[in-house]
Amino acid sequence: MATATAAGCSGAVALKSLGGRRLCIPQQLSPVLAGFGSHAAKSFPILSTRSIATSGIRAQVATAEKVSAGAGQSVESPVVIVTGASRGIGKAIALSLGKAGCKVLVNYARSSKEAEEVSKEIEAFGGQALTFGGDVSKEEDVEAMIKTAVDAWGTVDILVNNAGITRDGLLMRMKKSQWQEVIDLNLTGVFLCTQAAAKIMMKKKKGRIINIASVVGLVGNAGQANYSAAKAGVIGFTKTVAREYASRNINVNAVAPGFISSDMTSKLGDDINKKILETIPLGRYGQPEEVAGLVEFLAINPASSYVTGQVFTIDGGMTM
């Protein structure tokens, strides 16, 4: 396992009012729970087994092994960059793609120990991974991150823009620094990473880009003007880039999670949990693995090759 450094947490959704209290649930704090993939199987029938979700890449890997033994040829596994991948949703995505046979660059901003653990888990499963510490809102860090992946594995096939932060506050009290920090990481970071990775994808006329947005980008939320604006921007950005890159066979989609199980939700009182769950038709929190299952489908499943410019909500029916 290799480690690179240069300088992530994906989003949050907040309930406007819960008995006079306001609650913000950071998605990136969502832990990868035991029984990996079990929840995804229940929620996404098309991904009801890991073999369906990853049949394309695993078939390639199996074929490569046979051909290599007989004729010295091989089929390369896809190279993936996941930003903000040290914990929560990003961690679940990195593990899912790593275990599916991809080579994964695990990006982090501060949580180096957690990122190393993600890489080790991928390697323990037989995959390849490296970590890179860098701030995706800084152009020089993004360029270094892309170079690290290319130097190690020769290319970038898939980009998952997951890194993000929240700096909540009512608009009248929000400081410009709170606004700018969220916009810089959650929106400008997506722009910088996409632009850098797309240069590589365009040359070979193939690639997949998945942006992690939020239901807040669709419906807004009091106290999160900065975050809502950034995620709405990610959604508009996704659709525009999908149009620009479609002729180069680059698929660009967004995933918009709702309330996702996290360390914070596990510590909530029964009354608060009850009020939150009343807003979710399915009556439960989502799991990081469910988001990862959807991302995996969009990233490597051949059945998603005709899907681009779409926003997939995964919120238990909260915004339908």
From Swiss-Prot:
Q: Where in the cell is it found?
A: Plastid, Chloroplast; Plastid
Pfam families xref list = adh_short_C2
| Highest taxon, organism lineage | Eukaryota
Q: Which Gene3D superfamilies match?
A: NAD(P)-binding Rossmann-like Domain
Which keywords does this chain's UniProt record carry?
Chloroplast, Fatty acid biosynthesis, Fatty acid metabolism, Lipid biosynthesis, Lipid metabolism, NADP, Oxidoreductase, Plastid, Transit peptide
Q: Which GO terms describe its biological process?
A: fatty acid biosynthetic process
Q: Quote the subunit structure annotation.
A: Homotetramer.
Q: What is this protein called?
A: 3-oxoacyl-[acyl-carrier-protein] reductase, chloroplastic
